[in-house]
Regions:
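C-terminal motif of bacterial Sec signal peptides marking the signal peptidase cleavage site
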Residues: 30-32
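Short, Lys/Arg-enriched N-terminal segments with co-localized hydrophobic residues
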Residues: 1-12
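Structural detector for internal amphipathic alpha-helices that build alpha-solenoid repeat scaffolds
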Residues: 59-71, 93-115
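Bacterial signal peptide processing site
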Residues: 34-36
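Compact alpha-helical subdomains of small soluble proteins
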Residues: 99-185
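Structural recognition of alpha-solenoid helical scaffolds
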Residues: 44, 71-78, 150
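Buried hydrophobic core positions in alpha-solenoid tandem helical repeats
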Residues: 48, 78-83
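Bacterial N-terminal signal peptides that target proteins for export
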Residues: 11-20
Length: 186
């Protein structure tokens, strides 16, 4: 037979164990499943950017090469939101990327947009150079201010594309974001 004192102690122990169990469950729920998977064919721009900034992006193609997921024209407005972000990222996935110099997130987002626009990667890596550069040395890579200017060119290009092109408004730069800017892809 249990005394009232024993029953009280057992109730307190049960309460303490229940609270401890709840605390463990809360901790596991907040820290347990932190790795977010990217869907190659239906990628999330925000998750892509987050993983690029933390250096955790690892999406591989069929050949085992880390590459940019399959973004489409519908993703361009979201990609443009990061075009002015000059955050230096640890790496950028590109078969062609040599990671020469600092890798700016915004410049890489412009590279993704250009890849969507052309249907193929526009250059050896997510770097732009001055259009009249003598060679491909890093001294010709764009400055932060020039990258911001290039981002403005892409934003203007995207906004202009929303209007229909007619035969009366023939413009050689209609679908060329960097046309006349003095910049080109490396």
């Amino acid at each position: 037979l249990r005394t009232p004192h024993d029953v009280l102690i057992l109730m307190k122990m049960k309460k303490t164990l229940l609270m401890l169990w709840m605390a463990v469950c809360l901790i596991v729920s907040f820290t347990g499943c932190t790795s977010e998977e990217m869907d190659y064919n239906n990628p999330d721009v925000t998750l892509f950017v987050k993983q690029l900034k933390t250096g955790t992006y690892k999406m591989k193609n069929d050949k085992g090469v880390v590459e940019v997921p399959h973004f489409t024209e519908e993703d361009i407005p979201e990609l443009l939101k990061y075009a002015e972000d000059l955050t230096i990222i640890p790496s950028f996935p590109s078969v062609y990327n040599m990671n020469n110099g600092k890798i700016r997130l915004g410049e890489c987002m412009l590279w993704v947009i250009e890849s969507i626009r052309q249907g193929t990667p526009p250059s050896l890596g997510c770097k732009m150079v001055l259009a009249n550069a003598e060679n491909y040395e890093a001294i010709y890579f764009l400055t932060d201010e020039e990258v911001l200017d290039a981002a403005a060119c892409y934003r203007s290009w995207w906004e202009e594309r929303q209007y229909p092109k007619t035969r009366w408004t023939i413009d050689p730069c209609y679908d060329e974001p960097l046309c006349g800017s003095g910049y080109r892809w490396w």
